[in-house]
């Protein structure tokens, strides 16, 4: 044991980067500039993938390379002593560690985490929990320390073990990247980065700082250090600093892809720690939570058994359990105790402690054991997450591509190209208007074609005509009696007073005018909405062009509506003439008379009237005769109006309206000096297009990285 924990405490627990991993390719992916429009379309798909063809699944064939379960990993330690490193199971595991972590790190560097959650280990803890000491012990470098909030931005700590190279570090944030060879520079550079990002005060920021450390002494591991939890604002801190920090932490730990590393001091009641409460809130079963107990040397005498119970998962159960570590105290830091010496001192502490020795024997104590455990957990977590991640990247890439398609192409700068661009836009718009007019437009599920909406109005018009004729049937006897008493002259019984008939016809024809105009107005609105929606679909990103077209739609609608209304009113004025061809009217009249004289026969059809007559009279009264004529005339008039009014509306409101709009669109092309003005985009549209192109680019690179990893 002592030999394993010498001056290079992690060497036994860490791995060699396999030379065959595509590190150069990963770097190449990260260094490429965002592509042009044409290049972006090419980069949206991995090699050998075709647009429109179902995406290949890259994971199934090679994914078993990572399927090492925890028992295999644990057992590999003992096998390593008996077998050569190349043949041991643990050696196989080592060959997979660095590529897996590098893959996720490269995806994070590409910015994929803006779109999707990546597998990660997030480190959280209350202030003064010993979180910084744990990270220092793992990384081998001094991190910002002090009272109050020292971690003010999320810090991505990438640890890479390379036994063949000297220590080197790299810090990157925003557009800054610094490299250094002295570990003592780390604390200063982190503080400077935090001041630039979060300001000189005590505020915090969600913006990431990335610190990469390559050394023979560090484990292969990536952690995300989050600000320590505070309850009360101190000094110049914002009053809601506690709320801000909790919101930042929750943003990370609530993701299912995140393992939560909760740092808790041994000398406090574990049930009262805010960090563990937050972890339990987002992970009630503790499936994603690992507890790290710190400061075991500060526990009160007599409470050691309580600490052991916690470490053995008997007090506050977590599915992944607990680890316990002893890091450098403030006095040891002041005395410049090296991390290697601290590791040896830690080992001796646990080895000689009467209570905590058992935890060391169980592999639950010391920083080196923690490092090995975290590396193992991260690899298994990546293994578990990659299939879903590949699917999410593919689906997100497709959604972004579809959104970019809806935004349309970028506007050309050349005037001639602008003309062709506008011609194409107008051509596509006119084609869609044609489809609306012909009833051939493509509709989504639960949507209705324009023609069907108009047809519903026409069907309602037929019902109005039926109701009007039924009204005549219901009151004709009463009204004819009134007219006969007022207007009958010297005619004998049975002679029809034509004036009475004509007056009733005029009255009930007039009642149809307003329903016909109502149908016209509703149809106008239906067509206007369809044309407007089509214009928005094609031109919504161009505010000036969109407004110009909307004005044309309104103007043409008004003209066609006025023409249609005038023709409808003219039609009803003509209906006041009371006319029907003799040949047609005689047939209808004969049919009605037959039904009247045969009341026990076939039931009358729609728009037909039937009147009772005394069976002992061979002829009808004048009232009855007028009723028969009204029935016959309204039968024929209703047929005429049922077709004629919809004809007028359909022709002027749909056909002529659409045709005039298409011609007006072509006239826009004559205004060449207006092209630049017409094609001005909304500011947010160009920003959205730029954002989507960048998103598609990084997701395409992520897909390429996954493809290269599994190929």
UniProtKB/Swiss-Prot annotation:
Domain Dynamin-type G: 115-387
A GO CC annotation given for this chain: synapse
Region named G5 motif: 326-329
Primary location: cytoplasm
Alphabetically ordered keywords of this record: Antiviral defense, Cytoplasm, GTP-binding, Immunity, Innate immunity, Nucleotide-binding, Nucleus
Gene Ontology biological process terms from the UniProt entry: defense response to virus; innate immune response; receptor internalization; response to virus; synaptic vesicle budding from presynaptic endocytic zone membrane
Positions contributing to GTP binding: 125-132, 225-229, 294-297
Location(s), subcellular: Cytoplasm; Nucleus
Cytoplasm keyword on record: yes
Induction: By type I and type III interferons.
Keyword Nucleotide-binding in record: yes
Domain of life, per lineage: Eukaryota
Domain GED: 623-711
Region called G3 motif, residue ranges: 225-228
Protein family (similarity comment): Belongs to the TRAFAC class dynamin-like GTPase superfamily. Dynamin/Fzo/YdjA family.
Role: Interferon-induced dynamin-like GTPase with antiviral activity against vesicular stomatitis virus (VSV).
Protein name stated in the entry: Interferon-induced GTP-binding protein Mx2
Originating organism: Canis lupus familiaris
Classification lineage: Eukaryota, Metazoa, Chordata, Craniata, Vertebrata
Gene: MX2
């Amino acid at each position: 044991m002592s030999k394993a924990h010498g001056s290079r405490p992690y060497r036994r627990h860490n791995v060699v980067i396999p030379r065959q991993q595509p590190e150069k390719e990963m770097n190449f992916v990260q260094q490429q500039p965002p592509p042009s429009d044409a290049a972006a379309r090419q980069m949206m798909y991995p090699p050998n993938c075709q647009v429109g063809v179902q995406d290949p699944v890259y994971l199934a064939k090679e994914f078993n390379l990572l399927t090492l379960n925890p028992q295999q990993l644990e057992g590999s330690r003992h096998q390593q002593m008996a077998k050569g490193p190349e043949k041991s199971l643990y050696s196989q595991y080592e060959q997979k560690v660095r590529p897996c972590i590098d893959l996720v790190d490269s995806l994070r560097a590409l910015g994929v985490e803006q779109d999707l959650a990546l597998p990660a280990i997030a480190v959280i803890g209350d202030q003064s929990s010993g979180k910084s000491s744990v990270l220092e012990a793992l990384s081998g470098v001094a991190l910002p320390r002090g009272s109050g909030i020292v971690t003010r931005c999320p810090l991505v700590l990438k640890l890479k073990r390379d036994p063949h190279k000297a220590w080197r570090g790299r810090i990157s944030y925003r557009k800054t990247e610094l490299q250094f060879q002295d570990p003592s520079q780390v604390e200063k550079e982190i503080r400077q980065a935090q001041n630039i990002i979060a300001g000189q005060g005590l505020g915090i920021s969600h913006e990431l700082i990335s610190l990469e450390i390559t050394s023979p002494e560090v484990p292969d591991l990536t952690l995300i250090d989050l600000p320590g939890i505070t309850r009360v604002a101190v000094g110049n801190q914002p009053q809601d600093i506690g709320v801000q920090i909790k919101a930042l932490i929750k943003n990370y730990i609530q993701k299912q892809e995140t393992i939560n590393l909760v740092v808790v001091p041994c000398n406090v009641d574990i049930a009262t720690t805010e960090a563990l409460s937050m972890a339990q809130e987002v992970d009630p079963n503790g499936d994603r939570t690992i507890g790290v107990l710190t400061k075991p040397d500060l526990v009160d005498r007599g409470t050691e058994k309580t600490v052991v119970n916690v470490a053995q998962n008997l007090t506050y159960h977590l599915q992944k359990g607990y680890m316990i570590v002893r890091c450098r105290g403030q006095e040891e830091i002041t005395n410049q105790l090296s991390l290697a010496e601290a590791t040896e001192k830690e080992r001796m502490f646990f080895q000689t402690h009467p209570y905590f020795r058992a935890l060391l024997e169980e592999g639950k104590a010391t920083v080196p054991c923690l490092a090995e455990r975290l590396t193992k957990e991260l690899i298994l977590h990546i293994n578990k997450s990659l299939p879903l991640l590949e699917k999410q990247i593919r689906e997100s890439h497709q959604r972004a591509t579809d959104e970019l398609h809806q935004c349309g192409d970028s506007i050309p700068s050349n005037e001639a190209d602008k003309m062709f661009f506008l011609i194409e836009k107008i051509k596509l718009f006119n084609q869609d208007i044609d489809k609306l007019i012909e009833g051939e437009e493509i509709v989504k599920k639960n949507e209705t074609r324009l023609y069907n909406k108009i047809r519903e109005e026409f069907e309602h018009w037929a019902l109005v005509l039926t109701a009007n004729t039924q009204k005549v049937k219901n009151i004709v006897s009463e009204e004819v009696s009134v007219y006969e008493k007022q207007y009958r002259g010297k005619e004998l019984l049975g002679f029809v007073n034509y004036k009475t008939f004509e007056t009733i016809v005029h009255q009930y024809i007039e009642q149809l005018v307003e329903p016909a105009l109502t149908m016209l107005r509703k149809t106008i609105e239906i067509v206007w909405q369809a044309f407007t929606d089509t214009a928005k679909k094609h031109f919504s990103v161009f505010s000036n062009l969109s407004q110009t077209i909307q004005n044309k739609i309104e103007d043409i609608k008004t003209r066609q509506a006025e023409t249609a209304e005038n023709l409808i009113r003219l039609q009803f004025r003509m209906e006041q003439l009371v006319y029907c061809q003799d040949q047609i009217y005689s047939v209808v009249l004969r049919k009605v008379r037959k039904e009247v004289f045969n009341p026990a026969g076939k039931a009358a059809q729609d728009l037909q009237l039937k009147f009772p007559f005394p069976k002992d009279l061979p002829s009808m009264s004048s009232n009855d005769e007028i009723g028969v004529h009204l029935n016959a005339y309204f039968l024929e008039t209703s047929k005429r109006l049922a077709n004629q009014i919809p004809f007028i509306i359909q022709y002027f409101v749909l056909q002529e309206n659409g045709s005039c709009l298409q011609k007006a669109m072509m006239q826009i092309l004559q205004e060449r000096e207006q092209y630049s003005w017409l094609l001005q985009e909304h500011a947010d549209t160009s920003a959205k297009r730029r954002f989507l192109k960048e998103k598609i680019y990084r997701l395409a690179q992520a897909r390429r990285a996954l493809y290269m990893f599994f190929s």
